[in-house]
């Protein structure tokens, strides 16, 4: 398992939004590049970078910052937020990203997705942004039925997804263990867990689920790391323990 720090960018700043709503910005930091370097220095093995301005407003003014982060760190960077067509995904891949996170594009027809995944499957990871049995798209401003997405993922033979609990994201309310266990029980995907991870206790709970299933690839943490609610070294020790 890995711990991946999350860096969300809105109007060139690092932000944290409660449940993805821009009117609920909780934290702001001026320099995303410095934060990315900081996490690499702390020992992060990868970074999770989301362009919230592109996801929510459809504005791509953070491209230069994203490219600079990729240039200035030596660890893998996954990017997401507004990657809703093949051209934009290819552009990010050409920057040298580890992988592109997609969700809204999964609404497109199966032929389009088959072509995309056959060409870039190792460079794409679907994000299942979960809210009460539905999946958030378009910056979590719209929702679609999970079944519609699942059928396509199965046909595309997707094996790994990010599972984000929207109701917990940015809230520091802790993880919903039952949501995670239910999702794992009903589906065959390996998952990365995001949304609501707020304490060392949450890390321990996730590690215990991993011991039961061995299907959790890692955790993606934003606000709790930024606010110091989770100590990086302690969390790493728990994740890496046998």
Swiss-Prot record:
Active-site residues, as the UniProt record annotates them: 8 (proton acceptor), 129 (proton donor)
InterPro entries the record matches: Aldolase_TIM, His_biosynth, Isoase_HisA-like, Isoase_HisA-like_bact, RibuloseP-bd_barrel
Catalytic activity: 1-(5-phospho-beta-D-ribosyl)-5-[(5-phospho-beta-D-ribosylamino)methylideneamino]imidazole-4-carboxamide = 5-[(5-phospho-1-deoxy-D-ribulos-1-ylimino)methylamino]-1-(5-phospho-beta-D-ribosyl)imidazole-4-carboxamide
Entry keyword annotation includes Ribosomal protein: no
GO CC aspect terms: cytoplasm
Compartments in which it is found: Cytoplasm
Pathway this chain belongs to: Amino-acid biosynthesis; L-histidine biosynthesis; L-histidine from 5-phospho-alpha-D-ribose 1-diphosphate: step 4/9
Keyword Nucleotide-binding on entry: no
Keywords in alphabetical order: Amino-acid biosynthesis, Cytoplasm, Histidine biosynthesis, Isomerase
Ranges annotated as spanning the membrane: none
Recorded GO MF terms: 1-(5-phosphoribosyl)-5-[(5-phosphoribosylamino)methylideneamino]imidazole-4-carboxamide isomerase activity
CDD domains: HisA
Annotated family: Belongs to the HisA/HisF family.
Protein's name in the database: 1-(5-phosphoribosyl)-5-[(5-phosphoribosylamino)methylideneamino] imidazole-4-carboxamide isomerase
Gene name in the database record: hisA
């Amino acid at each position: 398992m890995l711990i991946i720090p999350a860096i969300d960018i809105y109007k060139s700043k690092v932000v944290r939004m409660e449940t993805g709503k821009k009117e609920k910005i909780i934290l702001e930091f001026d320099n995303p590049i410095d934060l990315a370097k900081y996490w690499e220095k702390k020992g992060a093995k990868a970074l999770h970078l989301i362009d919230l301005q592109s996801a929510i407003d459809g504005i791509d003014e953070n491209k230069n910052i994203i490219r600079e982060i990729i240039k200035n760190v030596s660890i893998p960077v996954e990017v997401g937020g507004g990657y809703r067509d093949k051209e934009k995904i290819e552009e990010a891949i050409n920057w040298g990203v580890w992988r592109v996170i997609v969700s809204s594009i999964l609404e497109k027809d199966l032929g389009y997705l088959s072509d995309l995944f056959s060409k870039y499957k190792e460079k794409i990871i679907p994000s299942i942004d979960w809210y009460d049995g539905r999946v958030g798209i378009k910056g979590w401003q719209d929702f679609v039925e999970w079944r519609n997405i699942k059928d396509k993922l199965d046909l595309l033979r997707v094996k790994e997804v990010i599972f984000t609990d929207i109701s917990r994201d940015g809230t520091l309310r802790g993880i919903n263990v039952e949501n995670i266990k239910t999702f794992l029980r009903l589906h065959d995907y390996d998952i990365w867990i995001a949304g609501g991870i707020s304490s060392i206790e949450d890390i321990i709970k996730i590690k215990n689920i991993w011991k039961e299933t061995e299907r959790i690839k890692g955790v993606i943490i934003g606000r709790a790391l930024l606010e110091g609610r989770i100590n990086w070294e302690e969390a790493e020790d728990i994740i890496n323990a046998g």
